[in-house]
């Protein structure tokens, strides 16, 4: 038993230069650990509330000094003396202390920082890697890196509607080889863009952010890059999208590619896209409250492709349960800061997997050097992780942590590859 002896917090910067919170925990056996909390650019309306100061004279109102003081003055006195290994009890205490439905009283950023820092401290105290501490003896599956190599939408200053164009190295024999293939396609894409006189500036998540005539042009460029890198599209490397369609949905229509689209037109667009490209996954293809449209898309395409709920579910078990009942998706995007505690995150993943859904663990566009999500993806045997392009330190550190985990697992390590996408099988 290791007892929580001290809890501290500080304001740090995320990868976009905005403030976020870092929490540090000390145990009575001398163990210390810290956790940094990420922040999103395109956020779902139903996410747990991130607490910001609102003081326009500091960081344009985005400071988190109030959240820091909440950890030190309100949360710390309640959790000192807790057994750090009692994660569910700790998280339940934090949820009850907040008392709101969306963690808006204390702030999900304050709560999550404590939840993750305690988990890491408990793992270190037990002399276990975090993935093993959280996942137990069966944690062994290395995820397919869903690498966002071309950025649009809210992640880039470009005219491209779709937020993320990803490559998935499904044919690689190991995570190490998958990472290599993804990086080689990324560099090939830069070369292709340069050859065509297109911009090679980077978006928030390390992908290139050129202006393009259409979203299909982005996919076509990536296919050229896959071939240029020496790989076969669909066999070695597949494609995936995060449309983030809530960002361009208003008054019942999607402002997409220069004109309004009805939900039915969007479903038809995606159906044709899936027929034309080696697509394995589409995230947030429709707006976060268009449940019937989601169910329609799944009925049309769900036997062939993964339809991922991000803003739709916000890693919330209650919204996920509704989606399962309505057959509104077949995959869950997992973001720890959307729900605000490690326990609730694990509960959402368990519900998804028991219901036949896949799960994709994800970063946020505003990231820190924290690598928890790399361990989490292995802990829950998710089979998929989304943490940006193979560029920018806050993205690379997650990939590098997965390389270390693969080495640590040795012969027990299994790379998910094509099995991460059951609709590809057979």
Swiss-Prot record:
(2R)-2-phosphoglycerate binds at residues 163, 335, 364-365, 386. SUPFAM superfamilies: Enolase C-terminal domain-like, Enolase N-terminal domain-like. The keyword Lyase applies. GO terms for biological process: glycolytic process. It catalyses: (2R)-2-phosphoglycerate = phosphoenolpyruvate + H2O. InterPro entries: Enolase, Enolase-like_C_sf, Enolase-like_N, Enolase_C, Enolase_CS, Enolase_N. Binds a second Mg(2+) ion via substrate during catalysis. It is an enzyme of class 4 (lyase). Keywords: Cytoplasm, Glycolysis, Lyase, Magnesium, Metal-binding, Secreted. One of its GO terms (molecular function) is phosphopyruvate hydratase activity. Its cofactor is Mg(2+). Its EC number is 4.2.1.11. The active site is at 205 (proton donor), 335 (proton acceptor). PROSITE patterns: ENOLASE. The keyword Metal-binding applies. GO terms for cellular component: cell surface; extracellular region; phosphopyruvate hydratase complex. It comes from the Bacteria. Mg(2+) binds at residues 242, 283, 310. Belongs to the enolase family. Catalyzes the reversible conversion of 2-phosphoglycerate (2-PG) into phosphoenolpyruvate (PEP). It is essential for the degradation of carbohydrates via glycolysis. This is Enolase. The lineage of its organism: Bacteria, Bacillati, Actinomycetota, Actinomycetes, Micrococcales.
């Amino acid at each position: 038993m290791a007892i929580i002896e001290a809890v501290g917090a500080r304001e740090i910067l995320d990868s976009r230069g905005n403030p976020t919170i870092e929490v540090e925990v000390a145990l009575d056996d001398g163990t210390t650990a810290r956790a940094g909390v990420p922040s999103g650019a395109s956020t779902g309306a139903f996410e747990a509330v991130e607490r910001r100061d609102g003081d326009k004279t500091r960081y344009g109102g985005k400071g988190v000094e109030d959240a820091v003081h909440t950890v030190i003055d309100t949360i710390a006195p309640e959790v000192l003396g807790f057994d750090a290994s009692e994660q569910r009890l700790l998280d339940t205490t934090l949820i009850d202390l907040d008392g709101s439905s969306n963690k808006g009283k204390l702030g999900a950023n304050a709560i999550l920082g404590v939840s993750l820092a305690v988990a890491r401290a408990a793992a270190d105290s037990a002399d276990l890697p975090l993935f093993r501490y959280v996942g137990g003896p069966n944690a062994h599956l290395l995820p397919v890196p869903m690498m966002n190599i071309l950025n649009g939408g809210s992640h880039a200053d470009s005219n491209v509607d779709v937020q993320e164009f990803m490559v998935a190295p499904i044919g690689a024999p190991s995570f190490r080889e998958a990472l290599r293939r993804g990086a080689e396609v990324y560099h090939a894409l830069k070369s292709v863009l340069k050859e065509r006189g297109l911009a090679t500036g980077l978006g928030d998540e390390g992908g290139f952010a050129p202006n393009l005539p259409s979203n299909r042009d982005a996919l076509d460029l990536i296919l050229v890059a896959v071939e240029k890198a020496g790989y076969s599209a669909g066999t070695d490397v597949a494609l995936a999208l995060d449309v983030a369609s809530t960002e361009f949905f208003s008054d019942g229509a999607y402002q997409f590619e220069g004109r309004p689209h009805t939900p039915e037109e969007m479903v038809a667009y995606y159906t044709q896209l899936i027929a034309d490209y080696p697509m394995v996954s589409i995230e947030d293809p429709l707006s976060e409250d268009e449940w019937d449209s989601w169910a329609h898309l799944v009925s049309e395409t769900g036997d062939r492709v993964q339809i991922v709920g991000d803003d739709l579910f916000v890693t919330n078990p209650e919204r996920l349960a509704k989606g399962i009942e309505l057959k509104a998706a077949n995959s869950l995007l997992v973001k720890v800061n959307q729900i605000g505690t490690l326990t609730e995150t694990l509960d959402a993943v368990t519900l998804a997997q028991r219901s036949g859904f896949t799960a994709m663990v994800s970063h946020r566009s505003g990231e820190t050097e924290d690598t928890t999500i790399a361990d989490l993806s292995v802990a829950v045997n998710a089979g998929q992780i989304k943490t940006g392009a193979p560029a920018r330190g806050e993205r690379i550190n997650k990939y590098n942590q997965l390389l270390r985990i693969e080495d640590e697992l040795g012969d027990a390590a299994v790379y998910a590859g094509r099995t991460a996408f059951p609709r590809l099988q057979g």
